[in-house]
Amino acid sequence: MTEKKSVFITGAAAGIGRATALTFAKNGYVVGGYDIDDISLKSLADEIDDLGERAVTGHLDVTDPDETSLRVDEFVTAAAGRLDVMINNAGIQLAGRFEDIAVAAHHREIDINTKGVVNGLHAAFPHLRATPGSVVVNLASASAIYGQAELANYSATKFFVRAITEALDIEWGQYGIRVVAMWPLYVQTAMTDDVKTGTTESLGIRLTAQDIADDILKAVDPSWLRRMTHQVHFPVGTQAKTMATAARFSPAWLTRIANKRLAQS
């Protein structure tokens, strides 16, 4: 295998995915950036090229398992057989009262946010197993701490991501593969431009895409303490860390009351 590490990122054309692609490129990775937005991928590749680093980009609909497998295989071949990091970032977010959102829209959110992760994990596994010290990073959310009103379906998809992360970190540990999840709160990206809920009003939208990208890089190469404790979930930002800690040590009834009050603010 080549000495240069590689990272495959879904949803890489914009927002968190793009910031993460650039961050890993600046840290010497061969970057695989995949998305349905071919035009923005071209500009991402140009930007990485300007950094003097290498990018491989291509169209990818994460809900298509065959295309996902094809793109992962193509990238690993281009990266000389390595897949050091797999980042399942692609996702959408629908906000509003559950009954006001069309059922077809709910289904699409489930397809992208859950089936897209399954497709990525399944396609990446043989390459991760063949690459010593490989890591999977799944983009979950602080909404996987407790179900969020006006984000009910989205929150449910992120609980799925949380669960599959925990399970596969145990299953794949025998192959030396770490599986971790990021838990950001609201992030200033195009996905949240039109989102207005009780919790966005009470907590604000404070994180940037770069905040998440920086923490993803740290999660891939964690501190000795995080490595010793085998940290699986990484809340991003002060608010998410506070919420995660409070939920861990508070009784369920108190956590529910706190979330209800935030949603009604």
What is each of the regions a protein language model found here?
Residues 13-14:
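Conserved glycine-rich cofactor-binding loop
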Residues 29-43:
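Conserved glycine-rich Rossmann-like NAD(P)H-binding loop of the short-chain dehydrogenase/reductase
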Residues 38-39, 59-70, 103:
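The beta1-alpha1 cofactor-binding region of Rossmann-like NAD(H)/NADP(H)-dependent oxidoreductases
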Residues 97-98, 102-108:
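Substrate-binding pocket helix/loop in short-chain dehydrogenase/reductase
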Residues 121, 157:
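Active-site helix of classical SDR
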Residues 141:
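Residue(s) in the substrate-gating loop at a strand-loop-helix junction
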Residues 181, 201-241:
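C-terminal helical subdomain
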